[in-house]
Amino acid sequence: MITDTVEINRRPEEVFAYLDELDRHGEWQSQIESVKVETEGPTRVGSRAVDRRQVPGGPRDIPYEVTQHDPPRKVSFRGVEGPVRPVGTVTVEPLDDGSRSRVSLEFDLQGHGIGKLFAPFARRQAARQIPQDQVKLKERLESGA
């Protein structure tokens, strides 16, 4: 399990609203080349999207669904296809009477079939990338996104 936390000088409601826009995840997650949201309407339990990510071996589509949605505090997701599938939870906590936020990520990559061989490598790569992406998220939100 990979965990990472970042503090952001924005209200939790604003942070969660930005995270809730699945099609904007490529603005702060550097491996994402594109996002296709497959479910119409606001994000909710059961919402699905496909991230096209640059991974070793070339671009790969990573389909996932939202499994928990508790605005403005928590969202969980899980991959639904592929040999290596993401699973995670993002929690947004208020700081300083709600004027700032702490964003905590719990994340893992689960191997299925042949993916059990690749998951440890992918997990190590994600452990290096996630802190950088969290910094980009902070910078993006604090600059007015």
Each language-model region and where it sits:
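Beta-strand/loop substructures that line and gate deep hydrophobic ligand-binding cavities in soluble
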Residues: 78-132, 139
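Short beta-strand segments that buttress and anchor functional surface loops
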Residues: 47-54, 75-81
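Hydrophobic ligand-binding cavity/cleft-lining segments
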Residues: 1-44, 145
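Short, cysteine-centered beta-strand-loop-beta hairpins and adjacent loop/turn segments enriched
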Residues: 54-60, 111-114
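A short, structured loop/turn motif at beta-sheet edges
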Residues: 12, 40-43, 68-72, 91-102
